[in-house]
Swiss-Prot record:
This is N-(5'-phosphoribosyl)anthranilate isomerase. It comes from the Bacteria. It comes from Rhodospirillum rubrum (strain ATCC 11170 / ATH 1.1.1 / DSM 467 / LMG 4362 / NCIMB 8255 / S1). Gene3D superfamilies: Aldolase class I (3.20.20.70). The keyword Isomerase applies. The gene is trpF. PANTHER family: N-(5'-PHOSPHORIBOSYL)ANTHRANILATE ISOMERASE.
Length: 218
């Protein structure tokens, strides 16, 4: 089996970015969604990425996370930040995902909330228009954002699940539980945000390193 892909999402400072790059993660994610404690403006994201090797130079892929963003929001980010991958984490329709993929010429990750086996049925709607699917825990009722709540879901729902495109496991992953999550779900790619923080919205370099070690060493 190939090495598990690792994405660290919601980076907000230089120490977190440096830790992720030094640990050799495959993707680093930046959130462009105001209600999130990890929200960045494009100028700050560009600042954090200054000096980070591009993917073609051996660096990680740069992912921009959006939640039901309008065209103006997307344009503002792309005007200031060079991204490699788009991530849509809201209620974007398959048509919207396909439009963005063609408009920007970039691969797209579409996040889907999971609470039961029935939720996996939506995967088929997006598999033809997204390059990756991301399965996250369904947020609590009344939440103002779709992810980053440190909640897990029943990983066994994904055991044996076959999708036409690669998928990432997210939702409450930590250095302490990620090895078990991979074992139970069969995931070949994982995404973490709050699970490598000790202060909300700020990545802890030691936990980033521990998470990557737990994934790589199982």
């Amino acid at each position: 089996m190939s090495e598990t892909l690792i994405k660290i999402c919601g980076l907000t400072d230089e120490d977190g970015v440096d830790a992720a790059v030094e640990a050799g993660v495959d993707m680093i994610g930046f959130v462009f969604f105001e209600p999130s404690p990890r929200d960045l403006d494009p100028a700050r994201a560009a600042e954090l990425l200054d000096g980070v090797p591009h993917a073609e130079e051996g660096g990680p892929l740069r992912v921009g996370l959006f939640v039901d963003a309008d065209d103006a929001t997307l344009e503002a980010v792309f005007a200031g930040v060079r991204l490699d991958v788009l991530q849509f984490h809201g209620e974007e329709s398959p048509e919207r995902v396909e439009w963005a993929r063609l408009e920007y010429g970039l691969p797209v990750i579409k996040a889907l909330p999971i609470a039961s086996a029935a939720d996996l049925e939506r995967a088929a709607l997006y598999a033809e228009v997204a390059d990756y699917l991301l399965f996250d825990a369904r947020p609590p009722a009344g939440a103002d954002r779709p992810g980053g709540h440190a909640q897990t879901f029943d990983w066994s729902l994904l055991a044996g699940f076959s999708a036409p495109v690669p998928w990432l496991l997210a939702g409450g992953l930590t250095p302490e539980n990620v090895a078990e999550a991979i074992k139970v779900s069969g995931a070949t790619a994982v995404d973490v945000s709050s699970g490598v923080e000790t202060v909300r919205g700020i990545k802890d370099p030691e936990r980033v390193s521990a998470f990557v070690k737990a994934v790589r060493e199982g």
